[in-house]
A protein has these predicted regions:
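A short, hydrophobic/aromatic-rich structural module that often spans a beta strand
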Residues: 71-85, 90, 168-185
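Short hydrophobic beta/alpha edge segments that flank linear recognition/processing sites
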Residues: 44-68, 87-104, 140-164, 184-198
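C-terminal domain-closing interface element
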Residues: 197-205
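Exposed loop and linker-edge segments at protein-protein interfaces
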Residues: 33, 42, 79-80, 138, ...
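A general sequence property marking short-to-moderate contiguous segments
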Residues: 1-11, 79
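Long terminal accessory segments
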Residues: 185, 204-207
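Short beta-strand-turn/beta-hairpin segments enriched in glycine/proline and small hydrophobics
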Residues: 8-38, 57-74, 102-135, 153-171
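Helix-rich terminal scaffold detector
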Residues: 199, 210-216
Length: 216
């Protein structure tokens, strides 16, 4: 079993992730009026309809395209020597330091601590009706799973096939797929927690909720 408390302490020691902002295609770079230490924001609004801070503009064939911040963060590096230069696709322009939110810390811990049942291929996924009914009546934690149990329906190109769960016995702790949205092959669909590990995981999630301070 993973040492969940140790994992939380490691995250506390480096409570951020660095995001490299790279060019999506070739073009001439013009940086926005920003400097190292400035704070930028990502998309906002209920539907993320408000774009993030403009970091730079990439112009190709007289067609300028803004490069926007994907997350809230602090600029910690700008490759200002690229100003006005033609660059290839994938060229790093700057680095943002994004301070982790409470929800992101919980998500990171669960991804490490739970058994992740992954999508075998790109498709849409649904619970079988019996399981869906149980989740609606209570919650996902009420569903006990065992190896070989028929659990999901995989829908691809108008073809639906049952998908059996493979992994340790336990309860469904996290659901990562969204109905009517395609999940890529290898993407986690469910996070399953063995029954004997449930108290430890619940304890550390409670610690995150009470101890974690939002920053930035």
């Amino acid at each position: 079993m993973i040492d969940i408390s140790k994992l939380l302490d490691e995250i506390k020691a480096s409570p951020y992730r660095e995001i490299v902002i790279s060019t999506p295609h070739t073009g001439v770079v013009t940086f926005a009026d920003l400097k190292v230490g400035d704070t930028v924001v990502g998309p906002q609004g209920q539907w993320k309809e408000k774009p993030g801070t403009r970091l730079a503009t990439l112009e190709r064939e007289r067609n300028p395209k803004p490069i926007l911040a994907p997350e809230k963060g602090e600029i910690c590096l700008i490759h200002s020597d690229l100003e006005g230069r033609f660059v290839e696709a994938g060229t790093p322009l700057m680095i943002l330091r994004h301070m982790l939110t409470r929800a992101e810390v919980e998500h990171a811990i669960l991804k490490k601590a739970l058994h992740l049942f992954r999508a075998p291929e790109r498709a849409k996924y649904y619970f079988i009706p019996k399981v869906e009914k149980k989740i609606r009546a209570s919650d996902a934690h009420s569903v006990q799973v065992r190896d070989g149990m028929e659990l999901l329906i995989m829908s691809r190109m108008k073809r639906e096939v049952p998908l059996n769960y493979t992994g340790p016995d336990g309860v469904i702790y996290a659901i990562y797929f969204t109905i009517n949205e395609n999940m890529d092959a290898g993407a986690p669909l469910l996070g399953v927690c063995p029954q004997d590990q449930l108290p430890a995981i619940q304890d550390v999630i409670m610690r995150v909720q009470t101890e974690w301070t939002e920053r930035g």
